[in-house]
């Protein structure tokens, strides 16, 4: 869609869309913008065209299930919105010093996490023309004030050398403009690799990426839209962006000890990413949190198709009891008890009593206090 010059200028200066209006407010209500108290974190999502960026983003933020991503296209912009998410596609045309017109493509999304924390997600188009412009005419604009760079690699790419070249160009721009940014590399589409080869291929790719990233450090994840690995990676990324996460974890531990729970997890309400957890002993399945995220997210989607909303769930047998319930305005909580003789009502009352305290902790500028109630 063609924009006027004034619209382009505004978009380039603001570098992001307005937030969705509250319920009851008409679309496009004047004055509904990001509040001044919001703590914005700029996140770059980059990678070559076809690497799978749009599919993974649509699953995490737009409530797609994996099989529906095959039909992604023009409908993606119709689906990638909720009470927390607003998205806009910006295509800029610039004229260089010799009169050539260049175009680049960035989709901006504002995703609200935990009260005042807002992720300003820049999904950068991966076509060669766009990539070259990011490193030349728009270098400072794209790579300035970045908190996190997420670079997605297609594990089966036939242009690995070019992929690595673009990644190194990103690192050079980050080092110059945002040297404190955290770097995440997602080796994506691992489901296409033979199962007995996955560990070896990922290890080799991880070693290459760590070597190329020096002097910066990068965290590498193997991912696929078909299993819990996608949630594992994005939970780890979001965890790095939560400003008071240590305070949150300390209070979560106190809460678990007070109610004698084996495990307590906090899920972000819209995405169901794990943002914090406490466990009193090691468990056999290291990926169980992400598996739960995936299962509950799909169950929530099934509920929405029936015009119902997911609020809580209880699973109980002779060995344990597990509760998933709305916790704060931005989170769900999961409590696992190894003593199934404890009445459900007692656990649910404890969850309810802790809500107000954790609501305060979610505020970026909230009080730094500890849970001491009994």
UniProtKB/Swiss-Prot annotation:
Any one Pfam family here would be Gtr1_RagA
Q: What class of enzyme is it?
A: hydrolase
Record protein name field: Ras-related GTP-binding protein B
Q: What is its EC number?
A: 3.6.5.-
N-acetylmethionine is found on 1
Query: Where is GTP bound in this sequence?
Result: 49-50, 52-55, 69, 75, 126, 188, 225
Please tell me which positions the record assigns to the cross-link Glycyl lysine isopeptide (Lys-Gly) (interchain with G-Cter in ubiquitin). Answer: 203, 281, 291, 305
- Which keywords has UniProt assigned to this entry? Acetylation, Cytoplasm, GTP-binding, Hydrolase, Isopeptide bond, Lysosome, Membrane, Nucleotide-binding, Ubl conjugation
Among SUPFAM superfamilies, the record links this protein to: P-loop containing nucleoside triphosphate hydrolases
Function summary? Guanine nucleotide-binding protein that plays a crucial role in the cellular response to amino acid availability through regulation of the mTORC1 signaling cascade. Forms heterodimeric Rag complexes with RagC/RRAGC or RagD/RRAGD and cycles between an inactive GDP-bound and an active GTP-bound form: RagB/RRAGB is in its active form when GTP-bound RagB/RRAGB forms a complex with GDP-bound RagC/RRAGC (or RagD/RRAGD) and in an inactive form when GDP-bound RagB/RRAGB heterodimerizes with GTP-bound RagC/RRAGC (or RagD/RRAGD).
Q: Name one GO biological process term.
A: positive regulation of TORC1 signaling
Assembly description:
Interacts with RRAGC and RRAGD; heterodimerization stabilizes RRAG proteins. The GTP-bound form of RRAGB (in complex with the GDP-bound form of RRAGC or RRAGD) interacts with RPTOR, thereby promoting recruitment of mTORC1 to the lysosomes. Component of the lysosomal folliculin complex (LFC), composed of FLCN, FNIP1 (or FNIP2), RagA/RRAGA or RagB/RRAGB GDP-bound, RagC/RRAGC or RagD/RRAGD GTP-bound, and Ragulator.
Protein encoded by which gene: RRAGB
In which family does this protein belong, per the annotation?
Belongs to the GTR/RAG GTP-binding protein family.
User: Where on this chain does GDP bind?
Assistant: 50-55, 69, 75, 188, 191, 209, 225
Q: Spans of biased composition, class Basic and acidic residues?
A: 1-15
Give a yes or no for keyword Endoplasmic reticulum in this entry.
no
Q: Where is this region: Disordered?
A: 1-29
Q: Where in the cell is it found?
A: Cytoplasm; Lysosome membrane
- Activity regulation per the record? The activation of GTP-binding proteins is generally mediated by a guanine exchange factor (GEF), while inactivation through hydrolysis of bound GTP is catalyzed by a GTPase activating protein (GAP). The Ragulator complex functions as a GEF and promotes the active GTP-bound form. The GATOR1 complex functions as a GAP and stimulates RRAGB GTPase activity to turn it into its inactive GDP-bound form, preventing mTORC1 recruitment and activation.
InterPro entries noted in UniProt: Gtr1_RagA, P-loop_NTPase, RagA/B
GO CC annotations on file: cytoplasm; cytosol; Gtr1-Gtr2 GTPase complex; lysosomal membrane; lysosome; nucleus
Q: Which reaction does it catalyse?
A: GTP + H2O = GDP + phosphate + H(+)
């Amino acid at each position: 869609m063609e924009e006027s010059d004034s619209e382009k200028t505004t978009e380039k200066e603001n570098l992001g869309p307005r937030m969705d209006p509250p319920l009851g407010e008409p679309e496009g209500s004047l004055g509904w913008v990001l509040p001044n108290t919001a703590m914005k974190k700029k996140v770059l999502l980059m990678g070559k065209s076809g690497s799978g960026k749009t599919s993974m983003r649509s699953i995490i933020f737009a409530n797609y299930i994996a099989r529906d991503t095959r039909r992604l296209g023009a409908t993606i912009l119709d689906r990638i919105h909720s009470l927390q998410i607003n998205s806009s596609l910006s295509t800029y045309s610039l004229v260089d010093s010799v009169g050539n017109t260049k175009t680049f493509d960035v989709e901006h999304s504002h995703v609200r996490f935990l009260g005042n924390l807002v992720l300003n997600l820049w999904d950068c188009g991966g076509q060669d023309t766009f990539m070259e412009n990011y490193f030349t005419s728009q270098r400072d604009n794209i790579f300035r004030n970045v908190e996190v760079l997420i670079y997605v690699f297609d594990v089966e790419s036939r242009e690995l050398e070019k992929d690595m070249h673009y990644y190194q160009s990103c690192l050079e721009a980050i080092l110059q403009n945002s040297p404190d940014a955290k770097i995440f590399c997602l080796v994506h589409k691992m489901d296409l690799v033979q199962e007995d080869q996955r560990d070896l291929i990922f290890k080799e790719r991880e070693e290459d990426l760590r070597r190329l990233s020096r002097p910066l450090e990068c965290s590498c994840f193997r991912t696929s839209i078909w299993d819990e690995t996608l949630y594992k990676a994005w939970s780890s990324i979001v965890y790095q962006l939560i400003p008071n996460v240590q305070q949150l974890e300390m209070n979560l531990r106190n809460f678990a000890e007070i109610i004698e729970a084996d495990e307590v997890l906090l899920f972000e309400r819209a995405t169901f990413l794990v943002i914090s957890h406490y466990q009193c002993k090691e468990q056999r399945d290291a990926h169980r949190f992400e598996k739960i995220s995936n299962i509950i997210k799909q169950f929530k989607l099934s509920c929405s198709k029936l015009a119902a909303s997911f609020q809580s769930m209880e699973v109980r047998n002779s060995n344990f009891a597990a509760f998933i319930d709305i916790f704060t305005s931005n989170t769900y909580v999961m409590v696992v008890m190894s003593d199934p003789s404890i009445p459900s009502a007692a656990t649910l009352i404890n969850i309810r009593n802790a809500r107000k305290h954790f609501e305060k902790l979610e505020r970026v500028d909230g009080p730094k206090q500890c849970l001491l109630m009994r």
